[in-house]
A protein has these predicted regions:
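Short conserved AdoMet
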Residues: 54, 77, 146
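N-terminal cationic-hydrophobic initiation segments that often serve targeting/anchoring roles
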Residues: 50-51, 74, 142
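Conserved beta-strand/loop positions that form the S-adenosyl-L-methionine
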Residues: 62-64
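S-adenosylmethionine
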Residues: 80-83, 87-168
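Residue-level signal for inorganic ion chemistry
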Residues: 20, 73, 155
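Conserved SAM-binding loop of SAM-dependent methyltransferases across substrates and taxa
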Residues: 66-79
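Class I SAM-dependent transferase core
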Residues: 1-56, 60, 90-107
Length: 168
């Protein structure tokens, strides 16, 4: 198991996975079928971001969906403030239900879309996973990144990343 996943944090991650799978049975918020898939393809995918988060960061997670990486970051970095941006009502319901069940006082769920003229705050970190192209994310959030802030984007295959970076 990863060093970040131990003790109380491991219990919270386990509870989160179980809640996500149960909710997913009726509401189809992601494509994983079992706990092992969620752990191996979602939770472990988010862990490299955790190491890049400093203490007391203000983080915006775009298109939070099933809580990856936003809820995972909130559990593993409880001293950081996490804003989960999601446009889907059912996904916001799930995120709020999960936040309350896990007593994540560092999480706010924002039910909204984002555009270039948004009035969101400034963040030290902006994350996204399967939200949009790198170029589109940069265009939509350029006014929301603090000076010396950074993007932590989970984008998948190297070929796709190279293609998106070339398009910028």
């Amino acid at each position: 198991m990863h060093k970040e996943l131990s003790g109380k944090k491991e219990e919270l991650i386990d509870y989160f996975i179980n809640e996500a799978l149960t909710f997913n049975l009726k509401h189809n918020i992601f494509i994983r079928a079992n706990k092992e898939e969620v752990l191996n393809k979602d939770i472990l995918d988010c862990l490299p971001l955790v190491e890049k988060i400093k203490t007391k960061e203000k983080i915006l997670d775009l298109g939070s969906g099933g809580g990856f990486p936003g809820i995972v970051l909130a559990i593993l970095r409880p001293d950081s403030e996490i804003h989960l941006l999601e446009k889907s009502q059912k996904k916001c319901y799930f995120l709020n239900k999960t936040k309350d069940a896990l007593k994540l006082k560092n999480v706010s769920v924002l039910k909204t879309t984002i555009n270039q003229k948004n009035t969101l705050e400034k963040y030290s970190v902006i994350t996204a996973r399967a939200f949009s192209s790198i170029k589109n994310i940069l265009d939509l959030t350029k006014n929301n990144l603090k000076e010396n802030g950074r993007y932590l984007l989970l984008k998948g295959r190297a070929e796709k990343i190279e293609e998106e970076i070339t398009a910028i």
